[in-house]
């Protein structure tokens, strides 16, 4: 059965400006600008109200999978709004049993070098996604802090670091060494 119309709205805060070019959404905020292309999804995007402070996503004559894209697009736009206002921060911790993992940040936080992983001489180099900055925590030992505006780029950079320290040819229940995400949050604290 097809539903005639399914729609959802996203409220836009005062300090955020959204512009639409077809199905491309551009979000401007205090921390910067994010753009995302939704051309591959057959939906209507429109700004409502006199001050254009509400985004509506419409899906006409959709089946179950097509109707699910309405909420997905709203979630993506909400993440973009959160990114340009608060920013996203992931904290990662080094875990090791014997050989201490040595992490060095190069090129202004865009390249992570992992040395002495399981005592290996090989240097693992992980390049951060564009717009993601990495730094070593001053407050906590063996902690990395990744920050940026785009949640997908920040989380993908964290995943690349974690995957660079996978243990090969050993029992992973025993060899738990690696760099893992310990905390997910925002750069600035939300005012409640």
Curated annotation (Swiss-Prot):
The lineage of its organism: Eukaryota, Metazoa, Chordata, Craniata, Vertebrata. It is found in: Cytoplasm. One of its GO terms (molecular function) is rRNA binding. This is Large ribosomal subunit protein uL6. SUPFAM superfamilies: Ribosomal protein L6. Gene3D superfamilies: Ribosomal protein L6, alpha-beta domain. The modification N6-acetyllysine is found at residue 121. Keywords: Acetylation, Cytoplasm, Ribonucleoprotein, Ribosomal protein. Component of the large ribosomal subunit. The ribosome is a large ribonucleoprotein complex responsible for the synthesis of proteins in the cell. The keyword Lipid biosynthesis does not apply. It comes from Pongo abelii. It comes from the Eukaryota. GO terms for biological process: cytoplasmic translation. Belongs to the universal ribosomal protein uL6 family. GO terms for cellular component: cytosolic large ribosomal subunit. Component of the large ribosomal subunit. Transmembrane segments: none annotated. Its main location: cytoplasm.
């Amino acid at each position: 059965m097809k539903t005639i119309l399914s729609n959802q709205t996203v409220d836009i805060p005062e300090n955020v400006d959204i512009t639409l070019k077809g199905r491309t959404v551009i979000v401007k905020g205090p921390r910067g600008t994010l753009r995302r292309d939704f051309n591959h999804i057959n939906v209507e995007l429109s700004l409502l109200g006199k001050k254009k402070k509400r985004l509506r996503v419409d899906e006409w004559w959709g089946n179950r999978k097509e109707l699910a894209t309405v909420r997905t697009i709203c979630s993506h736009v909400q993440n973009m709004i959160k990114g340009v206002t608060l920013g996203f921060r992931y904290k990662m911790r080094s875990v090791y049993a014997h050989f201490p993992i040595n992490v060095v940040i190069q090129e202004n936080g865009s390249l992570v070098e992992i040395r002495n992983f399981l005592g290996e001489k090989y240097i693992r180099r992980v390049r951060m996604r564009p717009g993601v900055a990495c730094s070593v925590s001053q407050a906590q030992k063996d902690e990395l802090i990744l920050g940026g505006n785009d949640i997908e780029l920040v989380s993908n950079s964290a995943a690349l670091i974690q995957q660079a320290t996978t243990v090969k040819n050993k029992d992973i229940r025993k060899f738990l060494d690696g760099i893992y995400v310990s905390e997910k949050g925002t750069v600035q604290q939300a005012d409640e």
